[in-house]
From Swiss-Prot:
It comes from Cereibacter sphaeroides (strain ATCC 17025 / ATH 2.4.3). Mg(2+) 2 binds at residue 66. InterPro entries: RNaseH-like_sf, RNaseH_sf, X-over_junc_endoDNase_Mg_BS, X-over_junc_endoDNase_RuvC. Keywords: Cytoplasm, DNA damage, DNA recombination, DNA repair, DNA-binding, Endonuclease, Hydrolase, Magnesium, Metal-binding, Nuclease. SUPFAM superfamilies: Ribonuclease H-like. This is Crossover junction endodeoxyribonuclease RuvC. The keyword DNA-binding applies. Transmembrane segments: none annotated. It catalyses: Endonucleolytic cleavage at a junction such as a reciprocal single-stranded crossover between two homologous DNA duplexes (Holliday junction). Its cofactor is Mg(2+). Gene3D superfamilies: Ribonuclease H-like superfamily/Ribonuclease H (3.30.420.10). The RuvA-RuvB-RuvC complex processes Holliday junction (HJ) DNA during genetic recombination and DNA repair. Endonuclease that resolves HJ intermediates. Cleaves cruciform DNA by making single-stranded nicks across the HJ at symmetrical positions within the homologous arms, yielding a 5'-phosphate and a 3'-hydroxyl group; requires a central core of homology in the junction. The consensus cleavage sequence is 5'-(A/T)TT(C/G)-3'. Cleavage occurs on the 3'-side of the TT dinucleotide at the point of strand exchange.
Length: 168
């Protein structure tokens, strides 16, 4: 299974692709979609095009997006929400199921604690994906989202199998 993880952002949208085979994870690619300052509609269109190209290039089977948080700056929160809309829309347009995870859930899955620092996330992503060269903190966060989704899908599959066995 190939998983695309996305860390939404208007200026920098991190993305990471991993392959999952059983309990084994393998890094495929990671990077950051950038949008220049200027007209909001053009920035969102740029993110949409870049993310669409990534889906076409790496052909993931599923995707996952990190939830955004609400802060005191309402305008910034709304803009971030619009970028998150692009992160949800592009995989959905490609027919992919999209998982959504809270930042603390991602950190808990990857690091073991829900309030981990960026450096801890990057360190654990490197441990999960040996040899990975991170394009930046946003790409590391996106890979962490992909790892979280892979674990969630595996856990769900084991639960469904156990329930099916119990029903027999």
């Amino acid at each position: 299974m190939r998983v695309l993880g996305i860390d939404p952002g208007l200026r920098n949208m991190g993305w990471g692709v991993i392959d999952v085979s059983g309990t084994r994870l393998a890094h495929v690619a990671n990077g950051i979609c950038h949008s220049d300052s200027g007209d909001l509609a053009q920035r969102l269109l740029s993110l949409h095009r870049q993310l669409t190209d990534i889906l076409a290039r790496f052909a993931p089977d599923t995707a996952a997006v990190e939830h955004t948080f609400v802060n005191k700056d309402g305008v910034a929160t709304l803009k971030l929400g619009q970028a998150r809309g692009i992160a949800l829309l592009v995989p959905a347009q490609a027919g992919l199921a999209v998982g959504e995870y809270a930042p603390n859930a991602v950190k808990k899955t990857v690091v073991g604690v829900g309030h981990a620092a960026k450096e801890q996330i990057q360190h654990m992503v490197r441990l999960h994906l040996p040899g990975v060269e991170l394009a930046g903190a946003d790409a590391a966060d996106a890979l962490a989202v992909a790892i979280c989704h892979a674990h969630h899908v595996q856990s769900s599959g084991r639960l469904e199998a156990a329930l099916a066995r119990a029903a027999r």
